[in-house]
Each structure stands twice: as structure tokens, then as C-alpha cells.
Amino acid sequence: MESAVTPLFRFCYGESLDDYVSARNKDSSSFTLIVMLSQPTPSCTIRSAREDDISAVNELAYITFPMACPDSVGPEDIIEHCASQFSTERLLNHLCNIAHYLVVAEDQNSHQLLGYMLLVAGAEMDPTAYENLQEKPSLGVDKLYVRKEFHGCGIATALMEHAVEQTFACGYSSLWLATNSYNKRALRFYEKQGFTPVGTRIYYVGKTRNDDVVLEKPLISSLSK
């Protein structure tokens, strides 16, 4: 993997919104992480999402979110959740929110979006779960999804490595996330990435209650070992 990346996620405590937006709007070619994936997968670019990506992110979100849901979550609940979380308006808001960073994995040849990730600073994702983290301040991985046909190709790993880069760049002490306790594939992946369980939370998809595992990957303490 070739890694030459300038941090994209510019939000730090005390930074003004104007400075953040100015940095994000710079030529994206100078903020690109090129990931060479195993054949037959083409190379892809991990980069900051742009306004003209929103329609494709919306489509990708609707395709990938159901894969993370257990059988107890019905189609009506999934549709309700997607309409709430992945609307064009909501996705556009991520681009101008100083504490959010929307990232995409783009096929360099076809320009199709293969995956995406949303990072959220601090406790916004779940204040109660955040209080149980071991290392703070922490950067949350709110969403990380890859097209099913590209599972196992290294795209999710590349997105997570990019999240680690941003965590260090902004001086955060850890990464954290939550996933459904029945999503064994995701739990195995996060364990391989160095996350460990630190608690649980209740998360609703539509009207259906889900029990999530909260996981954390300390970075500052692991760096000192």
C-alpha cells in the first residue's frame, strides 16, 4: 500500500469554521491517499467527500446499511432509518459541519464509490457511551460501509487506517464506534483493527431496539508502548 496523505480532517479544538471550510475546499488532489488493492480489484482513492458525491453516497448507504442489520429489523424499520439518516439534506450537512468528516473510497478507473465512512468528533454519536471510553477526547467512527462485492479487498482497512491518520492529526486519544452485537463479521474486523469492547448501548433502527457493542481503539497509550 502506498500511503502519502496530508490530513483532511482539520477540525481541532479552537479552530474556526472558516479555517476548516477553507482547508477542506482546497484542491482534493493534494489530500489523497492512494490504496493499491489486490487483483482483480482496481486501485481506489480514499478522499474527502464532495458535494457532487452526495447522490452516490445516498445510493451506497441504502445498499449497504441493511447488511449490518439482524433479522429482527424489518424492511419498514430499515426504510424509516435510511430516510432519516441518509437523506440528501442530512448528507450535505455533514460536509459543512465542523465536527464531521465524510470520506469516500472511489474506484480510480470507473469512479464508482466502493465505500464510505463518517467520522464524528467527541460525544455527539452517543454521549452516554462516550462517558465509558477509556481515552478522551475520542474520534467516533459513526459509519463505515463497503459494497458487498468488495468485502475482503482491503477497502474497509484502508478507510480505518485513514481514520487513524485523522485521529493523530487532530490530537485525539482514541477511536471509538458501536456495532450490532449480532454483526459477527464486523466485530471480527474491528478486533483485527485493534478495537476492544468497553461497553454496550441501545440503538433503535426505526421502532426496533438493537443491542450494540461499544468498542474503542486507544491510540496515544498504544503509541507509548
Where are these regions (language model features)?
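Active-site acidic-Proline motif in GNAT/NAT acetyltransferases
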Residues: R147-E149, C153, S181-Y182
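Conserved N-terminal entry element of GNAT/NAT acetyltransferase domains
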Residues: F31-S55, S221-K225
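C-terminal "cap" of GNAT-fold acetyltransferases
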Residues: L133-S138, S173-W176, N180-L187, E191-Q193, ...
